[in-house]
């Protein structure tokens, strides 16, 4: 009977034939020798396939969840745009981790490993492993904030399983160097020189209007922007704030997450800024200081878009500190490293050419 084990990898040995586990630990705490090669995998859960592609291991994928089969006018997932072949692969289940064990068992070639993010969503990892007999490795997707160590550990774990340890370290180093560059450009801005900003239209499991924001919006933090929605006790994720608060804050500059365009011409953040009398009193609206950003929360965090947005925001807030930066070119530099192709213009066209530009309002 196959032993149930989830996370796992205490050590790996590299051989000419691939990667084999020197030791694993099962769910009961048993340490078992179990050599194997990992040439075929599936990635379950938001962002899981993104991490695999960051590691340049897309050739190991044997099936995808149903979100990868969809093609819509709007798509802000650079990894999917850079690798359209994923959409023609077999399907193993529904998105957000709702895996189908029967479909997984029917795959040919069969996966040796299932990677899974957000284990609380969809199919329980232990039950999935019991039903399929395939090891399920749970990954903490983390973020660019306080959970950055978890993100890095997940990349390293995935890298060890796939024999992509060096690539995992390169990705981590790239992120750290990019974040350090942003800090070097803006770290000495005095508190009184920080611009007051607000970002609206933040997506959360779908598009939202202008009141949807994020108090801990990562790009603001990377360039020392003063996020007016960041108040004592504010949650870290997306929240909807009262319109009256936005008016009272009266930010110097407004940014719009362009995922809000999915709501259509008669709804969403841009429409609200144009038509809602409450927003007409905002000084940023009157001055035309409203700018479009790439959506970054699209089947979990797009880490490349977070960094690209930070460079654009920095250039708008402190142009003298970002004079050498072309935001579109910088975005493509980031995407080329992370997903293998420059996909900025593809996304810009999908979002009406409004990415990294002043948004015209009626």
Predicted feature descriptions by range:
Residues 208-237:
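Alpha-helical, coiled-coil/dimerization segments enriched in small aliphatic residues
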Residues 228-279:
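Pocket-lining segment of extracytoplasmic ligand-binding domains
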């Amino acid at each position: 009977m196959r032993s149930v084990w989830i996370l796992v990898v205490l050590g790996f040995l590299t051989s000419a034939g691939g990667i084999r586990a020197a030791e694993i630990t099962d769910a009961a705490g048993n340490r078992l020798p179990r050599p194997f090669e990992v040439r075929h995998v599936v990635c379950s859960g938001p962002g899981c396939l993104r991490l695999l592609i960051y590691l340049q291991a897309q050739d190991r994928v044997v099936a995808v969840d149903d979100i990868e089969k969809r093609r819509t006018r709007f798509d802000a997932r650079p990894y999917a745009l850079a690798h359209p072949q994923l959409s023609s692969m077999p399907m193993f289940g529904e998105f957000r981790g709702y895996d189908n064990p029967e479909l997984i068992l029917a795959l040919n070639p069969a996966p040796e490993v299932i990677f899974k993010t957000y284990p609380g969503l969809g199919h329980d990892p232990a039950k999935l492993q019991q039903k399929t007999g395939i090891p399920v490795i749970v990954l903490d997707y983390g973020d660019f904030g306080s959970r950055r160590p978890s993100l890095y550990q997940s990349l390293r774990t995935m890298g060890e399983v796939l024999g992509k340890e060096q690539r995992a370290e390169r990705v981590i180093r790239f992120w750290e160097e990019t974040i350090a560059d942003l800090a070097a450009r803006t770290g000495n801005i005095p508190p009184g020189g920080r611009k007051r900003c607000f970002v609206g239209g933040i997506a959360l499991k779908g598009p939202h209007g202008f009141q949807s924001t994020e108090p801990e919006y990562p790009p603001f933090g990377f360039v020392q922007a003063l996020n007016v929605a960041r108040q004592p006790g504010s949650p870290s994720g997306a929240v909807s704030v009262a319109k009256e608060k936005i008016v009272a804050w009266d930010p110097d500059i407004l940014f719009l997450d362009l995922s809000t365009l999915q709501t259509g011409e008669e709804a969403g953040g841009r429409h609200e800024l144009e038509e809602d009398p409450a927003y007409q009193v905002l000084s940023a609206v009157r001055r035309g200081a409203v700018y479009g950003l790439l959506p970054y929360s699209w089947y979990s965090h797009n880490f490349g878009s977070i960094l690209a947005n930070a460079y654009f925001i920095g250039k708008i807030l402190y142009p003298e500190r970002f004079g050498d930066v072309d935001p579109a070119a910088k975005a493509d530099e980031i995407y080329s490293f992370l997903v293998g192709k420059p996909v900025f213009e593809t996304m810009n066209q999908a979002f009406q050419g409004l990415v990294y530009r002043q948004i015209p309002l009626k």
